[in-house]
Design a protein with these regions (language model features):
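Short alpha-helix
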Residues: 211-234
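Conserved class I S-adenosyl-L-methionine
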Residues: 160-200
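A short SAM/SAH-binding and catalytic strip from SAM-dependent methyltransferases
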Residues: 130-145
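Class I SAM-dependent methyltransferase SAM/SAH-binding core
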Residues: 64-120
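A short glycine-rich, Lys/Arg-flanked "PGG" loop and its adjoining helix->strand segment in the class I
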Residues: 145-160
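Core SAM-dependent methyltransferase catalytic element
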Residues: 227-229, 243-267
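Conserved alpha-helix/loop element of class I SAM-dependent methyltransferases that forms part
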Residues: 27-64
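A short acidic, Gly/Pro-enriched loop at the edge of an enzyme's catalytic core
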Residues: 119-132
Length: 267
């Protein structure tokens, strides 16, 4: 099965199923949240439940061209749109994008939605955005280098990339031992993918959920730097739904900047 599996198509269907299962990251914000955002009282998350520091954002979000990357679900996009941003939500799941469309229709928000693979942002011209907002999602993407390269391309000079990702070290543990007995049994090497498991074991541990990829910190942080970004901030948070929360960070979030355009010296 795994030899012929298309991870993008598989994860598209898997995330559509997560909408049916009411996964917490598929629940749209209520009208009270967007109403407050319209008055300037807003927050969004990249990792866990901790709001992103406001100083990570542009000085004014009003009028900023924002790409909410792999960020469907009717959460971050509507909040930023209500706060005054020009928002495009890009996601691999039609059902997740439908959540954003529902909130936009309900609350009178202008949000553009685009379906696709986060490694291919060819729907957008170079320098289209002031901010790429990418909450935890690249765990479902097979390779990271194209993601960072595309983010760099579609950002304007001095544009911002805010991204969240899982701690790769979470994947060294046997998932069944961790989730059923809260036992830390070291079993896997990183980088790891759930596709590395025999199908029967993968279904026991992950059901028919999305395929996951641990990646590495080199791929996450080093990849951003290799694409040309300058890293300015890094924070961590526990994975509260996981037994590891008592011992290690489960998430990291970074803020990176595309360097301003440099004028050639006067000749």
């Amino acid at each position: 099965m795994t030899e012929n599996l298309d991870p993008v198509a598989y994860n598209r269907a898997a995330w559509d199923r997560e909408v049916d299962r009411d996964n917490e990251w598929t629940r749209p914000v209520g009208p009270d949240v967007t109403a407050r955002a319209r008055t300037g009282d807003w927050s969004v998350v990249l990792i866990g439940y901790e709001p992103v520091p406001r100083h990570w954002f542009p000085a004014s979000i009003k009028g900023a061209a924002v790409l909410c990357l792999a960020s469907g679900g009717g959460q971050q996009g509507p909040v930023l749109a209500a706060a005054g941003a020009d928002v495009t939500v890009f996601d691999n799941s039609p059902r997740q994008l439908a959540r954003d469309e529902q909130v936009a229709a309900r609350d009178g928000l202008a949000i553009r939605t685009v379906l696709g693979d986060m490694r291919d942002l060819s729907a957008f011209a170079d320098g289209s955005f002031d901010l790429v907002f990418n909450p935890v999602s690249n765990v479902f993407c097979p390779d990271l280098a194209p993601v960072w390269q595309e983010c760099f391309r579609v950002l304007r000079p001095a544009g911002l990339l805010l991204t969240g990702f899982l701690n790769p070290d979470l994947y060294i543990f046997d998932v069944e031992a961790l989730e059923t007995r809260a036992e830390f049994v070291v079993r896997h090497r990183v980088p790891f993918s759930t596709l590395d498991l025999p199908e029967a074991e993968r279904r026991r541990g992950y059901g028919d959920g999305p395929i996951e990829y641990s990646h590495t910190l080199t791929g996450q942080i080093g990849g951003q730097l290799a694409a040309g970004f300058v890293l300015t901030h890094l924070v961590e948070a526990p994975h509260q739904a996981d037994a590891t929360a008592r011992y290690m960070p489960g998430y990291f979030a970074t803020r990176a900047v595309k360097p301003p355009a440099v004028r050639p010296p006067a000749g």
